[in-house]
Amino acid sequence: MGYRNIFDAHAHYDDAWFDSDRDELLKSLPEKGVCGVVNNAVDLKSAQTVIALAEKYPYMYAAVGFHPENLDDVPDDYLDQIAALTKHEKVVAIGETGLDYHWDTPKPLQKRIFEEQLKLSLELDMPIVVHDREAHGDTFELLRKYRPRALVHCFSGSVELMREAVKLGCYISLGGVVTFKNARHSIEVAAEIPLDRLLLETDAPYMAPVPFRGKRNDSSLITYAAEKIAQVRSISSVQEFLDITANNCATFYKLKIL
């Protein structure tokens, strides 16, 4: 079935996996029902790329920031540079930033850079896109401290943690993981989260849904997650669910697109 109003809350179309056919793919997405994509930077170099893509494709927007795996060469004036980039009309958020304790980037450095970007998001009154991998305790300690307008992307916590996130004013995005066999926690969260706080994402090119797991992901495949979550929530119309999550994206990112 052909769906419309597909809004991908979180992707990485600057990734090298798209180098062979990026323009061809991105030109085709609106024909597949995609109405919006927020492309997330991981450092200052990728920030320039995601802004350039947002300039080229009307349906695309950008988030700029430092990812916790990309902190080897952070310049002293990085906050000033990020702040300058946010003045671009297609930049809608700070991100992707957060904490990732799966890898070996020093935790004190991760926490400092994340906290500084949290403060910046408040100073600029902008949403912030949060990465939280195996770091729930420290991530939520900082979210409690600053209470930003945050999207916890690819949410991997429990229902209890989701409820705390909602109380803090956060939004949550889910994607292809909900189609995996071992996705019990994600399914429970999808079933319980207030519908007005739920966004859909791909994290493209990663996290492709079943039956494409392990292959390159793109925004048109978000429908597999949408179908699964609609089923879990007993929403009879997948299109209605896509309409709701697209409106949620517009609300979170302060967009006038629908």
What are these regions (language model features)?
Residues 1-258:
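Mid-domain alpha/beta scaffold segments of enzyme catalytic cores
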